[in-house]
Amino acid sequence: MMQDLRLILIIVGAIAIIALLVHGFWTSRKERSSMFRDRPLKRMKSKRDDDSYDEDVEDDEGVGEVRVHRVNHAPANAQEHEAARPSPQHQYQPPYASAQPRQPVQQPPEAQVPPQHAPHPAQPVQQPAYQPQPEQPLQQPVSPQVAPAPQPVHSAPQPAQQAFQPAEPVAAPQPEPVAEPAPVMDKPKRKEAVIIMNVAAHHGSELNGELLLNSIQQAGFIFGDMNIYHRHLSPDGSGPALFSLANMVKPGTFDPEMKDFTTPGVTIFMQVPSYGDELQNFKLMLQSAQHIADEVGGVVLDDQRRMMTPQKLREYQDIIREVKDANA
């Protein structure tokens, strides 16, 4: 008995479970079929809502085109008016229609009313898809108020910012005046000069008087005027003096007795122009200075008491030529 009851319960439970499964499967299939059936309407609604949203965006960005609606006067018989009212027709707009520029709606010219500026722009009326437009109560005819035409404001004509201007003739570039070089004034030539050279002892020493006297006499100098030595045209002291020799220490004079005499050096000088050939006299003067320097152990210096150089010798020769040309 217990086994039969258990078997019955098992069978009843299995039937109940199968019934629940069948019912659930049937319910889900029904909901899915209804969802697929309503999807085209939802798509059309969503597309229409998108178009309405685009129109709202355009209205928000700026005041759109003013639309003029013709006001129909209510007839005496309302039933005839309702009967003559055409049924609204709904046109389906494809999804890509919103991307195309909207064409302005042309109204009949005879019923145009001057635009009235409302404080708030009228919002476009959204019409649901596939639903008839509800009937609106008849409006009382409103007499159109003609707004005064705005008077044109005559502003003073302003000249164009960039008016055409005739091109001015471009003047040909004038050559810059070339400053004439100032006439070079010829440096006046020397008509006389003094050529100087020195024979000096080495630094920190002095020339011995006895050695100096012997070297001076060997070079052909003779003690004479102004208590100095002179080199004449002839070695015996005859003829005009060619160049002279003086003491480097002021007053530049000598004592013929030079045994106990010392000096840092002597100065040899020649005045140009002089007797004879000045260039030959200069060579003789240079040879005499070198001979005395060799005998007393000294050195030959220029007029600035610097070491004699070949450049300085050429400078002396140029001075002599210049003086000769000036006195030619």
Curated annotation (Swiss-Prot):
Extent of the signal sequence: none
UniProt-recorded Gene Ontology molecular function terms: protein homodimerization activity
Ranges of biased composition (kind: Low complexity): 97-115, 123-171
Region feature Disordered, mapped onto this chain: 42-186
Cytoplasmic-side positions: 28-328
One cellular-component annotation, GO: divisome complex
Species this protein is from: Escherichia coli (strain K12)
Any further remark recorded for this protein: Has been isolated as a 91 kDa complex containing ZipA-EptA and an unidentified 24 kDa protein, but it was shown later that there is no physical interaction between ZipA and EptA.
Gene from which the chain derives: zipA
Record's subunit section: Interacts with FtsZ via their C-terminal domains. Can form homodimers prior to association with FtsZ.
NCBIfam families per the UniProt record, alphabetical: septum_zipA
Protein name per its UniProtKB record: Cell division protein ZipA
Pfam families: ZipA_C
